Amino acid sequence: MINGSTKIVGLIGHPVEHSFSPPMHNAAFEELGLDYAYVPFNVCPENLKSAILGAKSLNIKGFNVTIPHKINVMKYLDKLDPIAKLIGAVNTIDFKEMKGYNTDGIGCIKAIGEVTSIKDKNIVVAGAGGASRAISFYLARENPQSIHILNRDINKAKSLAEDVKNSKLTDNVDFDSIDKIVGYVSDADILIDTTPVSYTHLRAH
């Protein structure tokens, strides 16, 4: 039962209705006997700064961060974990230090690793936002044959591909318009979708 001593954590994004995080986290808190509550907050981009500052003032302990805030939220934090700084995106905030972290990449790599190896695979990444940045950097560390980053805004795809190359993790990364995805997928071993299309489908159901 929520009371005055309950610690609040949550998710910020726009939208958040699709998220499975609240039931998953709250079930875990209950099972572990932890006095925490996980709450989703639908925050429009123009309200991001006030939401972050307000959350700290309200003694909220931490946030997970989802689309579309993973990059822009960094400017409102005091510290960044080295990996989050390298990636250029944040998906977790600890308000105790106003510090941002990124766990998207390692989470994706571990999930794929349960099914297949990434080494020597031809990989297509759809999207070039915060999640795509994290995943692309981690993929590059696993020695894939190639990484193709496809995005609606081709300049964002180009920028991400160049950042991955500049990290010296791999040279086998390129970019293109997401309009050409059919041609890339036909030759791909692994397809990773980081675009909002999946969320739109979930909201429709």
Task: Label each region the model flagged.
Residues 147-164:
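NAD(P)-binding Rossmann-fold cofactor-contacting core
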Residues 141-146:
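Conserved S-adenosyl-L-methionine
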Residues 200-205:
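Conserved small/polar residues in nucleotide/adenosyl-binding loops
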Residues 188:
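An anion/phosphate-binding loop that grips the pyrophosphate of nucleotide cofactors and donors
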Residues 13, 121-140:
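Glycine-rich adenosine-cofactor-binding loop
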